[in-house]
């Protein structure tokens, strides 16, 4: 059976939907969900993700932890398998390691004279939080692929760096692909981590067959890290990291949008009403920005830039409407 005909397992922290009261289905937020929903609707897909809300946990329990069909608000249909980790483990995973530590490293946002300050609290959060949630999701994936020959598993983002190693240990025949949706920083930025944590992360992600990034510079940074931090032989021209008797392909895949989904949303009456409201509020000129409210988006710098623009060009006073549409992060 070709890889295009085999069932596909997607794994991410955040799933395509979350559930609210009364089985309300809400579309998952973030660029990862936006990017993957189009793929999921064109393949035989089971999407494994963390249960994010109390209603998600109840839905997982209702289906005995197994996959179940869902329909997104846009009408896309596929299977979802929600995994409930212990609240304590998930809190350490998300609020100590994934976001405050890994995300900051990969966006060069540490104030290195003060942070990170990695002590027992952080190392225990990695062992009993980050690794535990990765293990929970890995077990869910292994259950799904138990009877599938050479299963195809696509892992996503910085939340799940140790998961591929757990899959590889149990299923050496699996085809594992990991796409990192954020930058990959240069090797010196990773030296702030204790060696044990750093090597566990890198050996986990190098258990994949293919590792993908948005840009060639992120791809190059990752390969340089593998050479500098782990001493692996790297072929920069071919995009290969040699890990013992294995070759890991490292690729740059700029992630496309789901054009069909965008066109479908654009034709919705609600979008037309929103457009009319924007035009009603417009003066001679309109500046519209849409961002998630997180540090890497430089939201405050955008406001400052508009302030400088008005200082330098007073002729535009009262002639420009500036609207910032900020999504919770």
Give the location of each predicted region.
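Catalytic cores of carbohydrate-active enzymes across secretory and cytosolic contexts
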Residues: 1-329
């Amino acid at each position: 059976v070709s890889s295009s005909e085999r069932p596909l397992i997607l794994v991410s922290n955040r799933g395509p939907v979350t559930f609210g009261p009364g089985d309300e289905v809400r579309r998952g937020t973030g660029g990862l969900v936006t990017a993957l929903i189009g793929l999921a609707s064109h393949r035989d897909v089971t999407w494994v993700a963390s249960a994010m809300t109390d209603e998600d946990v109840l839905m997982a329990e209702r289906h005995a932890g197994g996959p179940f069909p869902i329909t997104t608000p846009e009408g896309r249909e596929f299977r979802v398998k929600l995994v409930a980790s212990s609240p304590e483990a998930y809190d350490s995973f998300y609020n100590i390691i994934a976001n405050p530590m890994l995300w900051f490293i990969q966006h060069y946002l540490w104030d290195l004279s003060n942070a990170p300050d990695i002590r027992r609290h952080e190392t225990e959060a990695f062992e009993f939080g980050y690794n535990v949630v990765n293990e929970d999701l890995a077990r869910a994936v292994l259950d799904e692929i138990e009877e599938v020959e050479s299963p195809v598993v696509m892992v996503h983002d910085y939340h799940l760096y140790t998961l591929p190693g757990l899959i590889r240990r149990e299923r050496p025949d699996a085809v594992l692909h990991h796409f990192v949706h954020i930058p990959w920083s240069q090797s010196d930025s990773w030296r702030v981590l204790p060696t044990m944590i750093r090597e566990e992360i890198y050996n986990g992600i190098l258990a994949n067959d293919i590792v993908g990034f948005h840009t060639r510079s992120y791809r190059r940074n990752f390969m340089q890290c593998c050479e500098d931090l782990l001493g692996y032989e790297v072929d920069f021209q071919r995009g290969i990291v040699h890990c013992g008797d294995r070759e890991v392909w490292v690729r740059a895949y700029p992630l496309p949008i789901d054009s069909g989904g965008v066109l479908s949303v654009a034709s919705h009456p609600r979008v037309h009403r929103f457009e009319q409201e924007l035009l009603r509020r417009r003066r001679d000129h309109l500046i519209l920005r849409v961002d998630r409210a997180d540090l890497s988006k430089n939201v405050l710098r955008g406001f400052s830039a508009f302030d400088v623009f008005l200082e330098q060009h007073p002729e535009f006073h009262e002639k420009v409407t500036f609207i910032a549409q900020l999504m919770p992060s």
